[in-house]
Amino acid sequence: MADIVSAGWAFLMVSFTFSLSLVVWGRSGL
């Protein structure tokens, strides 16, 4: 169960960072 929770948090952080970087790149015009 702990491994599933850890994997879920890892996936959440990766997806959040990826979406945030896309927003930053979009606003900077790259």
From Swiss-Prot:
One Pfam family in the UniProt entry: PetN
Protein keywords: Chloroplast, Electron transport, Membrane, Photosynthesis, Plastid, Thylakoid, Transmembrane, Transmembrane helix, Transport
GO molecular function: electron transporter, transferring electrons within cytochrome b6/f complex of photosystem II activity
Keyword check for Glycosyltransferase: no
Record InterPro entries: Cytochr_b6-f_cplx_su8_sf (IPR036143), Cytochrome_b6-f_cplx_su8 (IPR005497)
Source domain of life: Eukaryota
Subcellular location: Plastid, Chloroplast thylakoid membrane
Keyword Nucleotide-binding: no
Annotated GO biological process: cytochrome complex assembly; photosynthesis
Signal sequence annotation: none
Transmembrane segments: 4-24
Membrane topology classification: Single-pass membrane protein
GO cellular component assignments: chloroplast thylakoid membrane; cytochrome b6f complex
Its biological purpose: Component of the cytochrome b6-f complex, which mediates electron transfer between photosystem II (PSII) and photosystem I (PSI), cyclic electron flow around PSI, and state transitions.
Name assigned to this protein: Cytochrome b6-f complex subunit 8
Organism: Nephroselmis olivacea
Origin organism lineage: Eukaryota, Viridiplantae, Chlorophyta, Nephroselmidophyceae, Nephroselmidales
Gene: petN
